[in-house]
Amino acid sequence: MSLSNDDRKALVDYRIEKAWASFDEAQKVASISLWNLAANRLYYALYHAASALLLSDGYTSHTHKGLMSQINLNYVKQGKLLPEEGKLIRQMFTKRHEGDYEDFEETTEEEIREAVPRVKDLLEKLISINALKESKT
């Protein structure tokens, strides 16, 4: 399926909105000590922002691991993102996966408290990379 430029921009904007909504949800569930769910929502905040960035640059991914590979290949290795920023996406994916599927795996309050500002910073960076690209077109 091929998207027009207007459709692509609308989908990118929608995914950015979903990213911020997921981040807000993470903060809300963290406030009631639902740490695994907070990790889930933090991961999906990054996932939606990263998928918006990939789409804006014409890349596609059909799996979570594919998205992480595309981010690493097209943004980390190109110097647009720092290696630790790519690693943060992988770490949050792992926390989300463990919390959702593994027995006896519990995300801690400390892990979430440390992750929230880092995720917010990366969300802002992913979105700013997209905004800079948009301003040049």
Where do the model's predicted regions map?
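Terminal alpha-helical segments
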Residues: 1-137
